[in-house]
Structure formats: C-alpha cells, structure tokens
C-alpha cells in the first residue's frame, strides 16, 4: 500500500470525467485547482466534475484551492512581446502605458515606494534580470542584466523583499468565498512569509464559514523559510513550492531547503508537500527522465507527506501516465526505506498527551509486528498525529465526518474510512477491527492496534490504545 500521497493539478488536459476517473484509479489522492488561471465559472465546472467522479467511485477525493497570492506582474505590450538586450535601459512604470522595448506598466501601484537603487527585479521566473538604477514618482529605471524575450503579463519577483500591505487581495477574498461556497477542503496560500499572513487567512476563513478548511502554507521566499516555526503554529501544512522559491533565492539552495522544510514539518506534525517540475518532461513525453525519477524518489526518501503534479496533469499530453509513474516511483522507493530504524532514531517533539499517545501507538504497532493501526477520530487529528511518525504499519483512519474523511486522504500512510457513530468504545473497536480485516486483508493470528476515545462523539477525546489479535 503506497503511503506517500499524490496531488494533481486539474486543467484542460484532465478536466473530463473519464480522465479524472482514470487518474483516481492510477493513484491520485487530492485535486488542486490553480486560481492563478481561469474564471469562477470554469472552476465551478471542474468542481462539479470532481464531485461527480468521487461520488461515482465512493472515493474521498478532496479539493485544494491554490490562491493567486500577492502576485506582481507586468502589463501588456503593443506587439505582445519584445526582445531586450543586455546592458540597455528599461523602465517599469505605475503609469498606464502601452509597452514597447523601453517601457512597460506594472500591476502594483505602490511598487516604486517599496524599492531602492541597486535592487534586482526578475521577470518570467528569473529568465530576465534587471537592476534598479533610478527611481522617480512613477518610474523604476533599470539596467538590463540578462535580456531576452519579454511578453504580456509575465510574473515579477523581487528577491529579498516582503512588501507591505494586506496579505489577501480582493481577488483572493473573492476566490476564497467561492471556495467556501463550493465546499473545498484545503487552501494552498501562495507566498506566505510569516505567521501574520496565515493568521489573516485563518481569520477570513473562520469569519465566512470556512472553519473546517485546512491551510497549506506555500513557502516561496526567504522569509517563509526563516519563519517556518511560527508559520507552522497556525498552518495545517506546508508546500515546498520550488518554482518561485528557486527564483526568490539562489536555486542551488533549493535542495537543502527542501530537506530542511520536510524534516521540520515532520518533527512538528505538519503535512508537507513537495511540488514543482517533478515530472516536467511528461508534459510532452510519455516517460520521465532519469533525473525526474530521482527527484520524486528523493522527495519520498525525505519524508514528504505528498508529492505534486502541476503542468504534467493540468496541460500535459499524458496526465494519467504521469500519475501512474509517480505512484510507481513512490511505492518502490518506500519499499527501500527502513521506517522502523528511522522511527527509533528520530527525536520527535512530544508536546502533549495526544503526541505521546500517537507515538506510543506507533511503537506498539512496531514492537508487536502489527499488520495495521485503526484509529477512530471525529476530526481526524489523532490520525494525522499518528501519521506524522511515519510508522511502517498501514493506518486506517475512521471518521464520521465527510470533510475529515476527504482531508485524511492527504495524510501519509492513511486509508480513510467513513463510519457510523458508536455509543461505547467496545462497539467502536469491534467495528474498527471489522474494517481492518476487509481493508488490510488480515488473517487469523494477525495483530492490530486500535486507538480511539471513550466518548466517540466528542472531538479530542482520544485516550485509548488496544492490542487485538484476529481470531
């Protein structure tokens, strides 16, 4: 049973019912909708299709809304694109102009006040580099350090800068309200820099009926890396968004930062996603490169909760094959990891009773050579806490909540199961063992670990571990 989960971005190549069904059957666990592209009407059609497929399959397929975030972009050119030469002068302006080879408008009115002479501006994911030479009230006059083709609406990055102002734009707020209305499960928040960004998002969701939506903080700049501990105090998970991260900081640092963030999240009990360009060549080719296979495998070795497909599944020629290849790479890699040794040598942070109980659950499962861990949890919190320890024993997460059932499909090593409410712990554990027998294909003599609470209708009541032997 594969433990590392797979997130797939849905786009023109994968929005149909047949393709979505095949992607689920090939290993997709979570769908991602990128709100940097498309209208609400287009996203609504995708959401309807996703819900239709998951109902047809009886599969807990959660929906992740990825926000635009504080995006900075150039506006348009007369001829849609221009070619800039190294060493020439080029101006970014807050005025409304029609762009040419010397000037282009930007979408952020306060940009001039945020920069200083000597700062660098990167355009189109760092392919073009500019250095600020002069600032006026409306213009940023630059020297072109690395030229090339520049075209309409390309992204801008400002390494080392965290701009002032509200984290959530009006466009983001509109998208979030749309997501709440359509029962999305996760929000992937772009360009999170600090705790305050996550707090602003959490408050907005809570005030508008999105209390049960989990926040995944996308780490895409130096501030996000530096502030990871405080970000994890509020965020429910982290995405290592290597695309913009490799533009905002020197790209040679990205592998080390990836490992650092994954380890940090595992120790703190947060879900962590490795994303961007994992099987990039499969946008055009039916098989991944050897380097891409190694990249996916290393993300699994590092302990990622999930790995993600972007353009490969949204706009590529081979979305189903990309999912299947990623699943096969992950499953084979997991077979070559000694999770028992890793469990005992890792110095986990144990902050409370639930942490201690979850750690003990894993230790008991390993020591008794159990074939499975079955956890009954209203909110899914206990299941996620057991998952954080990366126990080699398969985990079945039982819940009475549809939302928790779906969200558990992002947790490492967990098979989510919908269950009824039970009046006693004995009845709950009886049904838990029945579920385990079906899902884990247990036989007489197999041990399983059962974890739950005496008051099954009350979230946060987990206080019991039981060892059962199948008769």
Where is each model-derived feature located?
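Non-catalytic helical/linker scaffolds that mediate oligomerization, partner binding
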Residues: 1-471
């Amino acid at each position: 049973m594969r433990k590392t989960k797979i997130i797939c971005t849905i786009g023109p190549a994968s929005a149909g019912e047949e393709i979505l069904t095949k992607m689920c059957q090939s290993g997709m666990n979570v769908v991602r909708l990128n709100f940097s592209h498309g209208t609400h009407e287009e996203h609504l059609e995708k959401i309807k299709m996703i819900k239709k497929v998951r109902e047809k399959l009886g599969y807990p397929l959660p929906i992740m809304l990825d926000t635009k975030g504080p995006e900075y972009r150039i506006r348009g050119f007369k001829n849609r694109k221009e070619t800039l030469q190294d060493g020439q002068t080029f101006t970014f302006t807050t005025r409304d102009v029609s762009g040419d080879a010397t000037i282009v408008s930007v979408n952020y009115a306060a940009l001039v006040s945020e920069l200083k002479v000597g700062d660098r501006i990167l355009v189109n994911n760092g392919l073009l580099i500019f250095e600020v030479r002069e600032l006026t009230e409306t213009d940023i006059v630059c020297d072109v350090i690395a030229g090339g083709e520049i075209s309409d609406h390309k992204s801008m990055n400002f390494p080392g800068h965290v701009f002032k102002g509200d984290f959530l734009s009006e466009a983001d707020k509109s998208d979030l309200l749309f997501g709440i209305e359509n029962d999305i499960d996760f929000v992937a928040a772009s360009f999170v820099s600090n705790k305050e960004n996550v707090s602003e998002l959490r408050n907005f969701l809570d005030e508008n009926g999105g209390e049960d939506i989990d926040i995944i903080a996308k780490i895409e700049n130096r501030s996000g890396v530096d502030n990871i501990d405080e970000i994890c105090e509020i965020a429910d998970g982290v995405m290592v968004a290597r695309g913009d991260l490799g533009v905002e900081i020197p790209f040679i640092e990205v592998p080390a930062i990836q490992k650092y963030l994954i380890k940090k999240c595992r120790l703190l009990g947060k879900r962590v996603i490795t994303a961007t360009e994992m099987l990039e060549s499969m946008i055009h080719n039916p098989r991944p490169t050897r380097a891409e296979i190694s990249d996916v495998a290393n993300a699994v070795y590092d302990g990622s909760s999930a790995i993600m497909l972007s353009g490969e599944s949204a706009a590529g020629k081979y979305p189903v094959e990309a999912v299947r290849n990623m699943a096969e790479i992950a499953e084979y890699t997991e077979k070559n990891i000694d999770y028992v040794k890793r469990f005992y040598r890792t110095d986990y942070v144990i902050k409370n009773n639930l942490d201690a109980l979850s750690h003990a659950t894993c230790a008991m499962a390993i020591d008794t050579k159990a074939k499975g861990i079955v956890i009954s949890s209203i909110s899914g919190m206990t299941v996620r806490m057991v998952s954080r320890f990366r126990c080699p024993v398969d985990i079945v997460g039982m819940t009475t909540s549809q939302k928790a059932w779906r969200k558990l499909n992002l947790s490492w090593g967990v098979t989510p199961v919908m269950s009824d409410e039970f009046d006693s712990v004995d009845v709950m554990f009886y049904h838990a063992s029945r579920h385990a027998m079906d899902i884990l294909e247990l036989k007489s003599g197999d041990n399983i670990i059962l974890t739950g609470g005496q008051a099954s209708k009350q979230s946060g009541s987990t206080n019991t571990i039981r060892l059962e032997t199948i008769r």
